[in-house]
Design a protein with these regions (language model features):
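Active-site neighborhoods and metal-handling regions in enzymes and metal-associated proteins
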Residues: 1-368
Length: 368
């Protein structure tokens, strides 16, 4: 077994042990993971996605005290074995493959393993029970191997963003800008789970400006939720063909207050309230109600969004993507919380930046 496969197998085995401990505490017979997010987590970076916008994929994972089984059909089995769960047995997985037209055979197989006992699931059906909240929270704390994958993803997603905005021109349409962004991500083996683009006219109108045929004009925003190995790198950048708006300085101060509240042992609601105070200090109190501020990220673009009452405790190993905004301007990066504080995973040293309270933060790219 190669060193890479050994590391992946160790990660999978640790996660299987966690699931089996959960089974014991819950008195359940099996855990059935249907979502592409949980598939990526339990397989240490595999993908069950074919339709990229779907929440569930072409395979599930069934875990009992004795087995860990990939449930799929004949269409997908060979590719999953060879490309997504390479060395399946070495990782701890077997396969149950059913004919694509006889999906009921999968259900019979699950019933044969679980009997009439409780089955837990991330997306429960037919009497299954939801996963314990503690297990969902445990997924938010990323291990060393996950953090390594995340760092590589963040770096390459930021490079893709910079590449596209440096090439952008005022006569490009929003579709062209978004298409160039998706191309730059795919070329790096990254799924463009979300690519938003808006030009000069639409920027101040909508907080979620899906692209259109309009030319971008004097300024544009590009947003990525970029997925690889199940993890999401979320970032936003702007280009201005001329001077950037002065408002970016005020927004950077708002963001600095929010980021400064991200500390192990605090709650996610404390970060929300820090943003609330910062908007009020900037005389932009209404902005808090015009868009959410982001929150914890990881195997979803937002695992948990910060609200006034989100009691989730913050821990080292969690990833965050906050997105404070005014009308027509936003700032967003993906950070990992470590022993020394927040580390920006989507930082590009070649992108224009300002030192804001000791942290390098992105400015608008000004093209003259």
């Amino acid at each position: 077994m190669s060193e890479a496969l050994q590391l992946r197998a160790a990660e999978v085995q640790a996660k299987l042990a966690l699931l089996r401990a959960c089974l014991g505490k819950a008195g359940a017979a099996a855990i059935r993971l249907r979502g592409i997010d949980w598939f990526a987590w339990i397989t240490a970076g595999g993908s069950s996605a074919v339709l990229q916008c779907a929440e569930t994929g072409v395979a599930e994972v069934l875990v009992t005290q004795d087995e860990a089984v990939i449930l799929t059909d004949e269409i997908e089995a060979a590719r999953l074995r060879e490309e997504e769960v390479q060395g399946g047995l070495n990782l701890g997985f077997s396969f149950h493959v059913s004919p694509w037209a006889q999906i009921e055979l999968r259900e019979r197989y699950v019933l044969g393993l679980a009997g009439e006992a409780v089955v837990l699931s991330d997306r429960p059906h037919n009497g299954e029970q939801p996963l314990p909240h503690a297990l969902r929270l445990r997924r938010l704390v990323l291990g060393e191997a996950e953090q390594m994958r995340y760092r590589a993803l963040g770096r390459e997603a930021a490079e893709a963003m910079s590449e596209v905005l440096r090439a952008a021109r005022p006569d490009w349409t929003e579709y062209q800008l978004a298409g160039a962004g998706a191309h730059a991500l795919w070329r790096r083996g990254i799924h463009p789970a979300l690519v938003m683009a808006a030009g000069e006219r639409r920027l101040p109108l909508y907080r979620h400006p899906v692209p259109t045929h309009e030319p971008i004009g004097k300024r544009a925003m590009l947003v990525f939720c970029a997925r690889r190995h199940g993890l999401y790198a979320n970032l936003t950048r702007f280009v201005s063909f001329g001077a950037a708006p002065q408002e970016q300085s005020a927004l950077l101060e708002v963001e600095a207050t929010g980021l400064g509240a991200v500390e192990a042992g605090k709650s996610l609601s404390a970060v929300y309230h820090a943003f609330d105070a910062a908007y009020k200090h900037a005389d932009r109190a209404e902005a808090l109600n015009e868009h959410h501020q982001g929150g914890i990220t990881g195997y979803l673009a937002r695992e948990i969004v910060a609200t006034p009452s989100t009691a989730t405790g913050l821990e080292a190993g969690m990833a965050f993507a906050f997105n404070p905004s005014f009308a027509g301007i936003k700032i967003e990066d993906t950070f990992l919380l470590g022993a020394q504080g927040l580390d920006n995973l989507t930082y590009d040293p070649q992108w224009p930046a300002a030192n804001v309270h000791g942290r390098q933060r992105p400015l608008w790219l000004e093209v003259t």
